[in-house]
Protein backbone atom coordinates (compact mmCIF):
# COMPACT_ATOMS: atom_id res chain seq x y z
CA UNK A 1 0.00 0.00 0.00
CA UNK A 2 1.67 3.21 -1.20
CA UNK A 3 0.90 6.50 0.54
CA UNK A 4 1.83 10.10 -0.24
CA UNK A 5 4.25 11.74 2.19
CA UNK A 6 5.40 15.35 2.49
CA UNK A 7 9.12 16.04 2.86
CA UNK A 8 10.20 19.04 4.94
CA UNK A 9 13.64 20.62 5.07
CA UNK A 10 15.34 20.01 8.43
CA UNK A 11 17.16 23.38 8.34
CA UNK A 12 14.44 25.87 7.36
CA UNK A 13 11.24 23.82 7.83
CA UNK A 14 9.89 24.40 4.31
CA UNK A 15 7.75 21.57 2.93
CA UNK A 16 9.27 21.40 -0.54
CA UNK A 17 8.50 17.92 -1.88
CA UNK A 18 5.74 15.31 -2.05
CA UNK A 19 6.79 11.70 -2.52
CA UNK A 20 5.34 8.22 -2.09
CA UNK A 21 6.43 5.34 0.08
CA UNK A 22 5.42 1.76 0.72
CA UNK A 23 4.34 1.55 4.37
CA UNK A 24 4.89 -2.20 4.53
CA UNK A 25 8.55 -1.98 3.45
CA UNK A 26 9.36 1.38 5.11
CA UNK A 27 7.36 1.81 8.33
CA UNK A 28 9.83 4.40 9.69
CA UNK A 29 10.04 8.00 8.51
CA UNK A 30 11.73 8.62 5.16
CA UNK A 31 14.83 10.84 4.96
CA UNK A 32 16.31 12.09 1.67
CA UNK A 33 18.91 14.64 0.64
CA UNK A 34 17.08 17.07 -1.65
CA UNK A 35 17.61 20.61 -2.93
CA UNK A 36 16.13 23.41 -0.80
CA UNK A 37 15.40 26.55 -2.81
CA UNK A 38 15.30 28.76 0.29
CA UNK A 39 18.77 27.66 1.46
CA UNK A 40 20.14 27.28 -2.12
CA UNK A 41 21.82 23.98 -1.25
CA UNK A 42 21.15 20.27 -0.77
CA UNK A 43 19.85 19.52 2.73
CA UNK A 44 18.28 16.61 4.56
CA UNK A 45 14.50 16.42 4.06
CA UNK A 46 12.44 14.36 6.49
CA UNK A 47 8.91 12.98 6.24
CA UNK A 48 6.26 14.99 8.11
CA UNK A 49 2.85 13.93 9.34
UniProtKB/Swiss-Prot annotation:
Protein name, entry field: Large ribosomal subunit protein bL33A
UniProt GO BP: translation
HAMAP family: Ribosomal_bL33
Family stated for the protein in its record: Belongs to the bacterial ribosomal protein bL33 family.
UniProt keywords, alphabetically: Ribonucleoprotein, Ribosomal protein
Entry keyword annotation includes Ribonucleoprotein: yes
Organism encoding this protein: Staphylococcus epidermidis (strain ATCC 35984 / DSM 28319 / BCRC 17069 / CCUG 31568 / BM 3577 / RP62A)
Top-level division of the source organism's lineage: Bacteria
GO MF entries: structural constituent of ribosome
UniProt biased composition (Basic and acidic residues): 25-49
A Pfam cross-reference name: Ribosomal_L33
Residues covered by region (Disordered): 21-49
